Regions:
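Conserved SAM-binding loop
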Residues: 77-80
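Non-catalytic substrate-recognition/targeting regions of SAM-dependent transferases
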Residues: 1-16, 139-163
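Conserved SAM-binding loop of SAM-dependent methyltransferases across substrates and taxa
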Residues: 51-63
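A short SAM/SAH-binding and catalytic strip from SAM-dependent methyltransferases
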Residues: 105-119
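S-adenosyl-L-methionine
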Residues: 1-43, 54-55
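A short acidic, Gly/Pro-enriched loop at the edge of an enzyme's catalytic core
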Residues: 93-106
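Conserved SAM-binding motif I beta-strand of class I
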Residues: 63-70, 137
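A short glycine-rich, Lys/Arg-flanked "PGG" loop and its adjoining helix->strand segment in the class I
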Residues: 118-134
Length: 163
């Protein structure tokens, strides 16, 4: 994957023989590019549902806090940090029921297929973000459901959709 004029070496975990499957998606790329446009310097950044750690690796210079939901996500992110020469000790993470980062400025969320899991993420982010925080969400178009927007509107005043 290329981000901010750098090539990032990413692989799926567990590994797969299917070469058409990548460790990142167009949603990751769109979320990252949009976030870059907001300015990331001196911002507290949270990452949610970063399945293989693509966003964690891409934003490693900004010390993002990853919210991890399962062991394979944890292993994949550690693997990809190591594959890119990044120290795993500097990487902070917690689970969505006990987010260890507060006053988040920008949250990047790849929306899961489950509306219930999305609602948990949004609910927890709402509790840890500031009133002026920005939450950028991305998803695979084929998985879209209007329910996601309805859920976001339960917690936030300004909910908009693009692309």
């Amino acid at each position: 994957m290329r981000f901010n004029n750098k090539t990032i070496n990413l692989q799926r975990y567990p590994n797969t023989a299917n070469r058409s499957l990548r460790a990142w998606s167009a949603a990751d790329e769109l979320i990252l590019e949009t976030a870059l446009g907001l300015g990331l310097e001196k911002k507290k950044i949270a990452l949610m549902h970063d399945t293989f750690g693509a966003m964690a690796v891409a934003l490693s210079t900004h010390n993002p806090h990853s919210i991890i939901t399962n062991a394979s996500q944890l292993k994949a992110t550690k693997l990809n940090l190591a594959n890119n020469g990044l120290d795993k000790k500097d990487w902070e993470h917690s689970n969505p029921l006990n987010i260890q980062s507060t006053d988040i400025d920008i949250a990047l969320l790849k929306i899961p297929k489950s509306a219930d899991l999305f609602q948990l993420y949004i609910q927890q982010l709402h509790a840890t973000c500031k009133s002026e925080s920005v939450i950028l969400c991305g998803f695979m178009t084929r998985n879209f459901t209007a329910r996601w927007k309805e859920i976001a509107e339960l917690y936030f005043d300004d909910v908009s959709q693009s692309m």
